[in-house]
Amino acid sequence: TCENTRYTSMFYWTIPAGFVTGRHVHRVQEETFYILDGECEWHVGDKTIRATPGTYLFIPPGVPHNIMNVSEKPARVLMTVSPPGHEHYFEELAELAAQGSPDPEALADLRHRYDTDQISTLTTRA
């Protein structure tokens, strides 16, 4: 987590089966992902990457991307973010989602605070 560093945070992210982040971009933040379990598809810029255990991805600032868990089981990912703190975005997003359909203004505020410009919506596969 970001509690003891000024530059990077590292954390595990469990991506539910069928979850899709929706296309988004970070103006300042850079991200790395290392796939531990499961199978995901990343759309990074104009490329599609099928990520299986052992795949490492780097997403620089300003590059639109989305992540989709294409398997029937949760995927586990080790994620780093610089500057640190993006793990709190996921924590707060989960809190909003637990209340039912998130309030659009609360969601927009959350995204603004965590350098996330959402281009398409969060979703799950049907």
Predicted regions and their residues:
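Hydrophobic small-molecule pocket/channel-lining residues, especially in calycin-type beta-barrels
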Residues: 2, 19, 39-40, 66
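Conserved hydrophobic/aromatic beta-strand scaffold that supports enzyme active sites
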Residues: 10-14, 32, 48, 56-58
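A generic "binding-loop/recognition-motif" signal
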Residues: 19, 28-29, 47, 63-64, ...
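Short beta-strand segments
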Residues: 21-23, 44-49
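Double-stranded beta-helix
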Residues: 66-126
